[in-house]
């Protein structure tokens, strides 16, 4: 038996990127990285929807609205930036956003990747946005495309 494995291909794949605006210089890099990766893998501009929300907390709600009203996407990439502060606010938001995105992925049986940076400081966040390492938005898009491809194979074998 041959194992099923998806390939990162964007041709004929409809994807949404939901990105937060808070910490916009870094968040913008994540969204741009996801967008560039979509095009690098053959995506058509008309098959990509980009939605910007005020902060990371709003990401799950925006994804749910997109999926509930259109149902036209093969995958979603969630992009945002959370920087740890001196209060517990960071932990509450990070946990809530991660749980919300995960729950939506399961509820809609759809690949939704978590490209939300959770970092102890701005320097670490910049590193995860592609300054000293991979851009988390780009890697999230590649994963989303691989999973969309895999989902198209499941049940056809």
From Swiss-Prot:
GO cellular component, one term: cytosol
Residues that bind 5-amino-6-(D-ribitylamino)uracil: 22, 56-58, 81-83, 114
Positions with a binding annotation for (2S)-2-hydroxy-3-oxobutyl phosphate: 86-87, 128
Keyword tags: Riboflavin biosynthesis, Transferase
Pfam name, any one: DMRL_synthase
Positions annotated as active site in the UniProt record: 89
GO biological process, one term: riboflavin biosynthetic process
Reactions the enzyme catalyzes: (2S)-2-hydroxy-3-oxobutyl phosphate + 5-amino-6-(D-ribitylamino)uracil = 6,7-dimethyl-8-(1-D-ribityl)lumazine + phosphate + 2 H2O + H(+)
CDD domains: Lumazine_synthase-I (cd09209)
EC supergroup of this enzyme: transferase
Family: Belongs to the DMRL synthase family.
Protein name: 6,7-dimethyl-8-ribityllumazine synthase
Organism lineage string: Bacteria, Pseudomonadati, Chlamydiota, Chlamydiia, Chlamydiales
Gene: ribH
């Amino acid at each position: 038996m041959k194992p099923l494995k998806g390939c990162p291909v964007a041709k004929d794949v409809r994807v949404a990127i939901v990105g937060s605006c808070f910490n916009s210089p870094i968040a913008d890099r994540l969204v741009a990285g996801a967008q560039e990766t979509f095009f690098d893998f053959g995506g058509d501009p008309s098959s990509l929807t980009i939605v910007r929300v005020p902060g990371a907390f709003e990401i799950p709600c925006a994804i749910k609205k997109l999926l509930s009203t259109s149902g036209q996407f093969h995958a979603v990439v969630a992009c945002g930036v959370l920087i740890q502060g001196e209060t517990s606010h960071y932990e509450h938001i990070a946990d809530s956003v991660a749980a919300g995105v995960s729950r939506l992925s399961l509820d809609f049986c759809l690949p939704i990747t978590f490209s939300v940076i959770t970092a102890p400081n701005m320097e670490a966040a910049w590193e995860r946005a592609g300054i000293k390492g991979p851009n988390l938005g780009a890697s999230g898009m590649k994963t989303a495309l691989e999973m969309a491809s895999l989902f198209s194979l499941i049940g056809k074998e």
